Amino acid sequence: MEMKKLGDIVLFKVPEEMELTNAQDIKRFVYENSFDKGLKKVILDFSETKYIDSTGLGTMVALHKQALMNAGAVVFLNLDSNIKNLLKMTALDRILNIYDNEREAIEFLNK
């Protein structure tokens, strides 16, 4: 999983799929490279992600909760329309921080 630092923000590129076989590894990688290091602002870039299952949704919620517990925030960036629809159907779009461009995501995290 690709990662880059943007000041005090960490951006992670989510792979093509986020599902049962890799969701735990993704969550662990994000924790180890952000929250565990005291970094509280995280962007997950879904621009390459085309499929997510219930385990992936659970991972998104877990990362969101972990950020809140650390007085931080996670932004979910560049979601595919099918993933956005799934979040709407589950009402997670009302809870999660979802943005379509990196500049707006960074502005949100820096306010």
Predicted regions and their residues:
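Amphipathic alpha-helical interaction surfaces in cytosolic regulatory modules
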Residues: 20-95
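Short, charged, intrinsically disordered terminal tails
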Residues: 104-110
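Short acidic-hydrophobic, aromatic-tinged amphipathic segments that line or gate anion-handling sites
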Residues: 97-101
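Acidic phosphotransfer microenvironment of two-component signaling modules
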Residues: 81, 103-104
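Short leucine-rich amphipathic alpha-helices used at interfaces
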Residues: 82, 110-111
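STAS-typified acidic loop motif
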Residues: 1-28, 46
